[in-house]
Amino acid sequence: LLLHDHGAHFSIGKEKMVRPFGVEASVLADADDWAEKCYDKQYVGDYLASHGYVVLAVDALFWGERGRKEGVRYDSQQALAANMLQMGMSWGALIAWDDIRSAEFLASLPMVHKEKIGTMGFSMGAHRAWMVSAATDVVKAGAAVCWMNTTDSLMTLTNNQNKGGSAYSMIIPGIRNWMDYPHVASIACPKPMLFINGLRDKLFPVKGVESAFSTMQDVWKSQSVENLLTTKFYDLPHFCSKEIQDDILEFFNQNLK
């Protein structure tokens, strides 16, 4: 289950993970440009599929074919979030719920081994990956690239999480009363999990990442499965390189095949 990023780029969603086919030239060009910008010119879905994995990628609400009929507009994120909150829902929670259902659908397919479902995402997709890994046992292993931190490290004047807009897609109201991001991710224990962040990632302060990694390491260690949690830094900005994708393939080969 491949979960696409946010990137404030809404014209495509699933096409960020799997190279589109049977689409207009403009959509293909859009996807290719994004793959170059964020994924080192390599589609993660195509890469994993070439190594024998069944891949499913679905648009999150507000992206691609689930976007605004009126056209892409950044500020409409807050309108969507506000309307959902007034109906007793939240955008971030709906995305998480959709990802759970996507995992269940993937597991139901006849060509898929339902006991070997993995998930991966970059940026917002990473947030989605550890959320769905924590939320359902349908998912057996998860890889998250460039989205892990602690609230205190993200609560700064310049961090995107405090500017509204895009942040609403990754906020579930009330959850911070009980636990922080690494605690939520730790609900996935004792599953195999891979967390990767960049030392030059301006969105996620290294100090906060280190603290979050330490919290998760303590949880996996408490269950005597510390060997199933891998936390790594790359000397990279907010980026999912081919080398990182090689790590992800190796991780899935070790834990799902």
Description of each model-found segment:
Residues 134-140:
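Conserved hydrolase catalytic core segment
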Residues 111-123:
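Alpha/beta-hydrolase fold nucleophile elbow
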Residues 200-204, 208, 238-239:
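Acidic catalytic loop of the alpha/beta-hydrolase fold
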Residues 83-86, 94, 101, 141-185, ...:
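Mobile cap/lid helix-loop segments that gate and shape the active-site cleft of serine hydrolases
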Residues 214-257:
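C-terminal catalytic histidine-bearing segment of alpha/beta-hydrolase fold enzymes
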Residues 188, 195-197:
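Short beta-strand/loop motif that positions the catalytic acidic residue
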Residues 121-133:
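Glycine-rich nucleophile elbow surrounding the catalytic serine of serine-hydrolase chemistry
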Residues 4-97, 107-108, 154-156:
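Cap/lid segment of the alpha/beta-hydrolase catalytic domain
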